Design a protein with these regions (language model features):
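Generic beta-structure capping elements
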Residues: 2-5, 18, 69, 80, ...
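N-terminal strand-loop-strand
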Residues: 1-13, 42, 46, 68
Length: 113
């Protein structure tokens, strides 16, 4: 997970992510964002869930989260990430997490009930 360095969610822990650039597929954006924010190379897996959240200035953000397998690199914060680290599900209760993330991951079956 990463600790967001900028708004929205500055200072909160979340899953790495970001905007899809013009012409990019979801998979291409995921690979790019993971490397930019964590230094990790990944292979994209299946979609695990999607959600809509309010953004800045009344915008709506469509979030699509995918499973991914790390294939290389060294974990380090970069780009929008102020920090990056591996976490166990039990660690999440002790961190300030972006709104709705725990609920979404639980609903999608990523975290236990």
């Amino acid at each position: 997970m990463i600790k967001r360095g900028h708004e929205p969610g500055a200072g909160l822990w979340s899953i790495p992510g970001g905007r899809i650039e013009p012409g990019e597929t979801d998979a291409e954006a995921l690979v790019r964002e993971m490397f930019e924010e964590t230094g990790l190379a990944v292979e994209v897996g299946p979609l695990i869930g999607s959600v809509r959240r309010p953004g800045l200035d009344g915008a709506v953000i469509d979030i699509r989260d995918y499973a991914a397998t790390v294939t290389g690199g060294t974990l380090r914060p970069g780009d929008d990430a102020a920090a990056a680290r591996w976490l166990e599900a039990a660690d999440l209760d002790s961190l300030e997490i972006t709104e709705g993330l725990i609920e979404a991951l639980t609903d999608w079956g990523v975290l236990g009930q």
